């Protein structure tokens, strides 16, 4: 059974932004089946801030790939913002990814020859926006993450924390339905990690939906809700008692 935060029931209406129903994922080695996700069901609603946790082998990375439309389930149903993506082919999945999801990765995934502003603007190239409008929107996002003064710097001229700020700005630039962050502070020191998670809190308070995949308790404690996986199923799904900040909902 998926968790429903009683304090936000009225705002969420009845349709989750992420609906996972009896999701199964197996990998096959010859005739041998290796089940990773074993009938997992989960609902995540608009304006939620959720951390996915679990030990190595729990299935959290596989679940992240399915949520991010980077992989498809072996069985079950996945609906993302009213789009049933369970059986979509690669081209359709790519279109959904570009439109609905903003990714933040541990390794930043910035193009080394592009400036910070050009990296942020990349999703808008695929969306067909004109160059002047792309750069204007990219600068707005860099301002949001407090990095507009580094807009002309390339990744090798930025610190790890600054690169991750660029990655967050890029994730936001296309106004996605979902921000999906995979170990976003894994390559950062503790002080910079805290600064990055404070940015995620600001994004959440602005009304964005965020899912963070992490194995670190201190990172998960920045989220409102913590879902713990073990052996391919949800072990617990609870509100985080340490979280007190509410989003500003329109």
Task: Mark where each language-model region is.
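Cationic, low-complexity basic patches in intrinsically disordered or flexible, solvent-exposed regions
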Residues: 9
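Conserved beta-strand-loop-alpha-helix hinge in the C-terminal portion
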Residues: 233-250
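ABC family nucleotide-binding domain
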Residues: 16-229
């Amino acid at each position: 059974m998926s968790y429903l935060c009683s304090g936000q029931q009225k705002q969420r209406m009845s349709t989750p932004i992420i609906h996972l129903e009896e999701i199964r994922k197996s990998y096959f080695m010859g005739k041998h089946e290796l089940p990773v996700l074993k009938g997992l069901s989960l609902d995540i609603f608009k304006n939620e801030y959720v951390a996915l946790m679990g030990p190595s082998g729990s299935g959290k990375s596989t679940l992240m790939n399915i949520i991010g439309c980077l992989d498809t389930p072996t069985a079950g149903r996945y609906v993302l913002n009213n789009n049933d993506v369970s059986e979509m082919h690669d081209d359709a999945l790519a279109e959904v990814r570009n439109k609905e999801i903003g990714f933040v990765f541990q390794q930043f995934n910035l193009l080394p020859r592009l400036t910070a502003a050009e990296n942020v603007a990349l999703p808008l190239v695929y969306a067909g926006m004109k160059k002047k409008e792309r750069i204007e929107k990219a600068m707005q996002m860099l301002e949001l993450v407090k990095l507009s003064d580094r807009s002309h710097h390339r990744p090798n001229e930025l610190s790890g924390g600054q690169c991750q700020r660029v990655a967050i700005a890029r994730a936001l630039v296309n106004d996605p339905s979902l921000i999906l962050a995979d170990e976003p502070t894994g390559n950062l020191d503790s002080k910079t990690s805290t600064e990055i998670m404070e940015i995620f809190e600001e994004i959440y308070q602005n009304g964005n939906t965020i899912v963070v995949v992490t194995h670190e308790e201190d990172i998960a404690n920045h989220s409102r809700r913590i879902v713990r996986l073990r052996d391919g199923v949800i072990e617990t799904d609870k509100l985080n008692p340490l979280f007190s900040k509410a989003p500003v909902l329109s």
